């Protein structure tokens, strides 16, 4: 067969939840590309939810905080060059209470996240990035706001919340609390409590959190931190900025992206949707590799003319037990089928 021109590939990927980290996925793609003589830049990405801390350098500190239901929790976070990166799930996450079944959706508090922010301030952080996602809480951030004793110091800090959703403040209960174990009656109670929290923030801090897109992230934590002066930023944009995504995209011939499950939410600010959009704007060919692709997402990909593969469809149960191998095989198959990417 004709020797293929080497292609510069950008592996800009999210985690495959439960089976492979974003870094492992990027590595698998790179190994497959390199075995065929192509160059590959590995760029693990995240959307502000779980996995963001890992993508932005990983934790280098551990603190004891109060977990969502009052029990002590050991939270990992990062402080480097006066930039703190805090993943709220480490302090106030649903996984700390054993999932929805072990949660008390009404009692669950963000106090531990506030304690981490307070500690970051005490240690001299000049920039604080709070990543939301995976929360047990719908307290509107009241627990965190109370725990931040040094909030006057926040005025001189670049304070950013990386939001993984665009949900509005008062909608947080109805949209997400059922996944955190809330009954219908509790959802109504939590909605009323969010209304009260919004009134409180407006009266005390002069900030109308109801008007902010993304303020409902992590059960309204994003809104509470916005009341203290945080900027709410789409998580993907923040991560892409930190890791130099735009420059890497401009420099490549082909983009490969992917995540564990592709569905309608993938196009609402999540990694794959954003990478597909960016590649389209830059007129770069793109391949999407996912564990599973639901029918809506499949239709969207067809409409956009984007090459896509579902591992589950092609490899069955191996897609879960040997995810990175399946990813590498998919990449190799694609590169052989489509020799001329340019």
Residues covered by each model-derived region:
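N-terminal loops that bind phosphate or other acidic moieties
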Residues: 2-342
